[in-house]
Structure formats: C-alpha cells, structure tokens
Swiss-Prot record:
It comes from Burkholderia pseudomallei (strain K96243). It comes from the Bacteria. InterPro entries: Ribosomal_L11_MeTrfase_PrmA (IPR050078), Ribosomal_PrmA_MeTrfase (IPR004498), SAM-dependent_MTases_sf (IPR029063). This is Ribosomal protein L11 methyltransferase. The gene is prmA. Keywords: Cytoplasm, Methyltransferase, S-adenosyl-L-methionine, Transferase. S-adenosyl-L-methionine binds at T152, G173, D195, N234. CDD domains: AdoMet_MTases (cd02440).
C-alpha cells in the first residue's frame, strides 16, 4: 500500500479544527508544524516549564496529513475544510511517501545487547551471537525493560554477579520481567515479579513463557508474605524512598538488595533512607545513573 502527505498552510486559529476534521474523514495521521520554522519569523510555541503558553498554535501553521494514495486529496481537504468551518479550502501540495518495509525497518533498529559477562538480550528475529551466551529473548514492547537503559543494565550486571543457585528473588517494579527472567536463568529458585501496571504484568508473563522461565507475577496486593534472599527494585528515587520500609522488610537478614532508577546526584539521599535497615552504598555508576546495593543487617 502506498501513501501520500497532504500539506496545507493556514492561520493558527484554523489549524486544530482542520486537523480534527481530517482525522474524522479518514486521514491516517495528522501533525501540525510551524510554517515559519528555520526562518526569522519562527515562533517558539511554549515558554518556561509550568507556565501556560500564550499561544496554542503557530501564527502560520502547516498541517500535514498522511493519506492513502487511493484517496482524492482535493475532495478530502475540501470536505475537511467545510467540516472545520473554513470559508474556503486552503491551497495544498502533495508529497509522495517512499514505500518501506516498516517491519524490517523497525527490526533493523534493535540489535542484540551484550551485558555483563555472558548476558545477551536478543530480539526474536536475531540469533544468539555466542553459543555459550546467557540469552534473554525479548522484543521491544509496552513494558519498560529491554536492557538498553543504564538502570536495567546495572541491575542485570549485579544479578549476574550475585544470584546463587536456589535463592529466592523478588523483582519489585518488574516491567517487562527482564530482571526476574534473568534471575531465573542465573539459577534462582522461587522468583516473584511485582508491578503496579496490569499491562506490564501481562507482558512479563508473556516474556517469561517465551524464555521458559518459571516466574510468578502479580500486582502489589499479590506480593507474597515472607522474605527473600534477593530483592531488586529498578523504579525511581521517590517511590524507592517511600517504599523503603516495605522493601527492606522483604529482604532476609543477611540477604541482598539492589536499587536503581536513581541518578548519581540522588544516591546519597536514597541511601540515607535505607541506611536504617540496610548496609548500602553505590555499587556501580553508568551514564549518570547508579545502582545501590547492600545487605540487610542481621539485627534488624
């Protein structure tokens, strides 16, 4: 199937109405740009963060609609202009959109990722680069965690070095399930993944099935009672601080915990909250992010 871009320029007061009408009448997508971009008349649309912008569209707006090549653009634009209440149909130009194998193009942007000593995160359309690799088959999807983000990488490196055969592991904020799956592949016994997002829980279950990893997933209310040998939480600094008591209570005395989703400048603040329960410090830093790791004190 081939496509074309219908490009029309018009005053800002009509841009939103025309865009909405084009979508209602069958345009596949619509975007609005500054028609004066890269000229002396270019106008910034937004000001300082937190302030209400003075304008919600550019003085001279360019509306770009992606349409099926079988659609008559003149008829479509005339109908949209009438629907939007314009006095006349704007002038327009057509641009041919080069046909692409979009699946192949998307796949080409995701290559296998090497992490730690033996870990490879491999999309389903690739083969494992090394015969002795510890392979996690994972495709980009709706849930966070494909190994590309520094925090995920840090936690994976820590798990590879930490997990011992048969240990119990809790992945709190599991996202795609990548850390829970890795823990299982590293030899862990009972592994549990918890996430606040039901969609992430379903994605994690699917990924575990694909990787033949026996992991139990659920929402926070499903988190089992009791303690774990290892707890890992790759979330963000504020939730980590709020959940410090709960997460620390999930670690067995003498057990290990790793926390990430923490910027280097936030490390001391997060560590100080956990210091009541855990002997904790920065384990490793990567691209401005840190992984904090420690051991729960026997006396707590």
């Amino acid at each position: 199937m081939s496509y074309r871009e219908l490009v029309a320029e018009l005053p800002r007061e009509h841009a939103e109405a025309l865009s909405d009408a084009l979508v209602e009448l069958g345009a596949l997508s619509v975007s609005v740009e500054d028609a004066d971009a890269d000229t002396p008349d270019e106008q910034p649309l937004f000001g300082e963060p937190g302030l209400v912008p003075e304008r919600t569209a550019w003085q001279h707006s360019r509306v770009i609609a992606l349409v099926d090549a079988t659609q008559d653009p003149a008829v479509l634009l005339a109908a949209a202009a009438n629907e939007a209440g314009l006095a006349r149909t704007p002038r327009f130009e057509l641009r041919e959109v080069e046909e692409q194998d979009w699946v192949r193009l998307t796949q080409s942007q995701f290559e296998p990722i090497h992490i730690g000593e033996k870990i490879w995160v491999v999309p389903s359309w690739h083969d494992a680069p090394q015969p002795d690799a510890l392979v996690l088959e994972l495709d980009p999807g709706l849930a966070f965690g494909t190994g590309s983000h520094p925090t995920t990488r840090l936690c994976m490196e820590w798990l590879e070095q930490t997990v011992q055969p048969g240990q119990t592991v809790l992945d709190y904020g599991c996202g795609s399930g990548i850390l829970a799956i890795l823990a299982k592949k590293c030899g862990a016994g009972r592994v549990t993944g918890i996430d606040i997002d039901p969609q992430a829980v379903e994605a994690a279950r699917h990924n575990s099935e694909r990787n033949r990893a026996d992991v139990t997933y659920g929402l926070p209310d499903d988190c089992p009672d009791g303690e774990f040998d290892i707890v890992v939480a790759n979330i963000l600094s504020n939730p980590l601080k709020l959940m410090a008591s709960m997460l620390a209570s999930k670690v067995k005395p003498g057990g290990r915990i790793a926390l990430s989703g923490v910027l280097a400048r936030q490390a001391d603040e997060v560590a100080s909250v956990y210091a009541r329960y855990i002997d904790i410090a920065v384990w490793r830093e990567h691209e401005g992010w840190v992984c904090l790791a420690g051991t729960r004190r026997e006396s707590h």
